[in-house]
Amino acid sequence: MSDVPVVVASGCHIFSGCGYPAPSLNDFNFAPIFTIGSFGFTKPMLLALLSMLVVIAFFWAAFARPKLVPRGAQNIGEMGVLFVRDQILRPFLGKKGDGYLPFLVSLFFFIWIMNLWEVIPVAQFPVPAHIAYAWILVAMVWITYMTVGVVKQGPLTFLKNLAIPGEVPWWILPLLVPVELASNILVRPFTLGVRLFANMFAGHILLLVFYTATWYLASLSIGAVFAAGSFVMVFVITGFELLIQFLQAYIFTTLTATYIAGSLEAAH
């Protein structure tokens, strides 16, 4: 489909006799920019690639030649790194977890930038609103904390700690073990991905609703009054989405830090 909403592409207005074409799942499907055989390179792929390049380019510019007194990009970069370290990593992992700082910094800024595309003209799509990209992020996190647990605790000890949370009566184990294993191995990554996807998906739908309503209601008659109200709501929702985009990157990275912390050592 076209990147332009149907209501805009069709020139449909409330007094032109056509019904309101509400946003749908079709607004999350994109025609390939180009194809190589059966592989199609789509807009979300491009935005994800650009997000990665932006993160790499920014931190390269900030820290390739660090100065004793930080200025410009280095100053902003240090603020970002310190934010992740002091607000996300240290509260859960302590100083012993500083080795995971590059991973958490990269994860936080990569997700944040992918979310920010929603409010950038022309792009106007949050990449995690396409659930496949949320699952890719979850897969990276899952592989990381499972690997950390196996390496740091040993496979058998790690599995035991996943299945049995501390001291519990023996008679409850047949019920507790499958529930804990499912929760830690399956439910945990599932909820992590769905939370990010659902928030970005819902936010994008809201923006589409008010954006298409603005166009649909626009005319020389009374519809213009309602169109103006809808247009104002586009800016209100955009401001709200800016906060949500940051919070979702923060929550996703914070939960990742807690999972890694749980893999480093058993809970007591």
Over which residues does each language-model region extend?
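Selective transmembrane helix interface/packing segments
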Residues: S2-H268
